């Protein structure tokens, strides 16, 4: 049992109990037989402070094992040496931001992806003139502006019908107004946002155009560091912390002229929608949470508070809340967007991605944020350009047969069939052991937050204390065994993508977060639910680095689905923020 959980109990913590916990961790690291034997050895050794032959014998009896005398002698000699080394190792304190030397590479199972990622996919073609045609509204009102896509807002900014200052002020006003119902805001950056908006207006007027995001407000999931602002990671332990660094993705968006207006909520340490201020809500039904952990990002975009936001995903944290809140979200290929300056959770699984209103919006944001960065050794430069169109005659779309087809997924398949897509039945490489591979995530997260766990300061961290406790018993051998199983899963997915180019649905969050494949959640269907009808999403998944195909196909489906005109009414009563 970890110190974190022991200290949460009402029983006093004695020196012998502390010794037992320490020894238990060390015997687990040593790999000394079963967990039962490790516990027994810890109990016996805590009594005298050293490991003896007699104590090993007693521990064998408790564990129901029999060791030879030679095994006992080896255990004593090697155990004492290793425990001394581990004491030295664990005495070194590391900040959560300290990187691991191990680098996850999604291409390792599919060497062809490395070359394929340097050029456009063969089914991509230059877009027709009307593919991203903009039809500005006849009247620009505060009621219509929150729901307009980025490309339309960009036209209004450049034709003098809108200023960035007005757009940013509207976003700030809406964030203030809706937050009591949604609990989606950690910090409003009013002063800096308005200053940046005025600068954007001046630059555009002078002909200095930074691109389509110039003057567009956005929100950051509060695990992105931004110098001079609170970066809380959703955890009470960090609720007043200010970091003096800025995440690479925020720096790139600033260079593109986008205006940061708010830090948005994340579930505590990137889990769920519960943070130290309460539970972030779904604008379509404020009786339920927004899901997470990109809780505030999805909620704020869904409610029309910001045109777009940046979220992150380790095991569903972009896809899940965007599906819950009925907005578009892109989880790019692992390594596509730098995580520099962001809270780490799992070095081998963390990904950043945009949440917005349309597929075109997502493409615009990805174009401004992707690419390698010295602060993230896993980040890479791979080809991406937007907009693109797909030649449907050359594209193979998979329909997953070994997963339940949800109504939104069937709607997407129906739209694809109607436009002549080549649909092929496939089966995902599922195994009962897939979930077990996520022990890698748990072990990495346990190490990132080792000091919190060791100190027992884990109050308000959702299920993390239990996960940290469990991860203490994951040996290095277990971690490496899981990594080998993960590679086999990656190889199976590489083989699958030799038969199709994309697939719809599949209930595959565990699989594709382990393999690093890109996925988009896309609103496609208006579904009757209580308290009001809501927009629901399907998912599309593509080969490594093929976000352009994902977005191009998503845009075709989006144009036929015609659900972007529906918005949540947000009529609930205010909630109490903690």
Spans of model-derived segments:
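N-terminal secretory signal peptides
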Residues: 1-18
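N-terminal twin-arginine translocation
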Residues: 16-25, 33-47
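Gly/Ser-rich catalytic/binding loops embedded in alpha/beta enzyme cores
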Residues: 67-315, 414
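A short helix-breaking turn/cap at a secondary-structure junction
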Residues: 129-136, 331-409, 560-578
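Short helix-loop capping/hinge segments that flank enzyme active sites or metal/cofactor-binding pockets
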Residues: 131-143, 213-233, 391-400, 436-487, ...
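Glycine-rich, small-residue loops and helix-cap segments
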Residues: 160, 215, 255, 259-261, ...
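Acyltransferase
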Residues: 161, 166-169, 198-202, 386-387, ...
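Short glycine/serine-rich loop segments
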Residues: 245-369, 513-525, 530-539
